């Protein structure tokens, strides 16, 4: 028998007689691994159990999220196991911690079904988060290669086409969520939509938990909403819309509601993140065929995205949802009532809007990534914002965003229409100041007060909400060490 064959036989014999061996020695750790352009890369924050070596913990995550089980198996010999094993290739300590590590893992692209987020996530987050070798585990970022991205459709509409359809350019979109979320009759619900749109908003929307309850069935809501939309469009001469939430118990029911919304003229429908990845992709495919904008509410995301040491960072959800094909996703406000560190939110927005991502540790972006011409997904800022913050919102979030003022419209002391007008005037005055080259951030309060001198609804809103803000320390902030650089 040739010597090389004897050597391979000896190695395999030792491997498969060993029963249980460390993951790092099973082939799931390779510090010299050469990355391929087609590799799917994942960055995990790992908190190993006491006594577990960080490299072994990283190898365990690589193994359990790809091909490994708790013992060696002979059937590995029937596969190209050396290729299909995920490879942990780098482990770095997390700055400012003593027990957390960033583990970089590469996956062969052929491990995943084309165009299936459900299959991708079944491996990456499917089983490994319950693994005993790690005390806590968080998926911080991913690089999806060009070749794999090309198997996904991306956003059904995209920001450019949405602006063309709605004839709205040079400023953020304006919207509001109908309040109260639950309990209104269909007729009163439609009245809220009409008044908000007539006052100057582009969109009204359902909230995440309004579906088809005893106090208002879905078809009743859809009809009254569209009556409000059509009347407001006729009165203002502008294209208007209302996000009709088609979320339901089954995908079949969702298709029924989507088709009905389309039939009665809605330009946009809405779904919730909690319906699951397969349902989201299914509705995105429908939306593209029907030429309907698809809005996604991130309902439920904070159950796994908010805690710093365990779960999934929201930037990963942003990437996945852009792949799935949604046109809008709630992505933070910075200044509102919901979690949102400014740098982290910037990273979320860039993941949704840029055509090519560069490594930016301050924004939590750990990989370069080309979006393979997938359309842009519009971020939505919603939750505890009002017109007095307009200069901050424009500065932090830019133009390609939907600013949604729910309480900040419907809570206006003079009514819904006045609340909408206050927001529209505040936005247009701030955009004008920016376009004139003024320091709209520093002069923001003065710009708003000057605009309010000729707009009663804006003055009433500023007097009511003044400088209300939700100033809490974010639980999720970037982990990086600033390094001074000198000029040459």
UniProtKB/Swiss-Prot annotation:
Signal peptide: none annotated. Belongs to the RuBisCO large chain family. Type I subfamily. The active site is at 179 (proton acceptor), 297 (proton acceptor). It comes from the Eukaryota. Its EC number is 4.1.1.39. Heterohexadecamer of 8 large chains and 8 small chains. Keywords: Calvin cycle, Carbon dioxide fixation, Chloroplast, Lyase, Magnesium, Metal-binding, Monooxygenase, Oxidoreductase, Photorespiration, Photosynthesis, Plastid. Binds 1 Mg(2+) ion per subunit. GO terms for cellular component: chloroplast. One of its GO terms (biological process) is reductive pentose-phosphate cycle. The keyword Lyase applies. One of its GO terms (molecular function) is ribulose-bisphosphate carboxylase activity. Its cofactor is Mg(2+). RuBisCO catalyzes two reactions: the carboxylation of D-ribulose 1,5-bisphosphate, the primary event in carbon dioxide fixation, as well as the oxidative fragmentation of the pentose substrate in the photorespiration process. Both reactions occur simultaneously and in competition at the same active site. The basic functional RuBisCO is composed of a large chain homodimer in a 'head-to-tail' conformation. In form I RuBisCO this homodimer is arranged in a barrel-like tetramer with the small subunits forming a tetrameric 'cap' on each end of the 'barrel'. Mg(2+) binds at residues 205, 207-208. Substrate binds at residues 127, 177, 181, 298, 330, 382. This is Ribulose bisphosphate carboxylase large chain. It catalyses: 2 (2R)-3-phosphoglycerate + 2 H(+) = D-ribulose 1,5-bisphosphate + CO2 + H2O; D-ribulose 1,5-bisphosphate + O2 = 2-phosphoglycolate + (2R)-3-phosphoglycerate + 2 H(+). It is found in: Plastid, Chloroplast. The modification N6-carboxylysine is found at residue 205. Pfam families: RuBisCO_large (PF00016), RuBisCO_large_N (PF02788). The record marks 337 as: Transition state stabilizer. The keyword Glycosyltransferase does not apply.
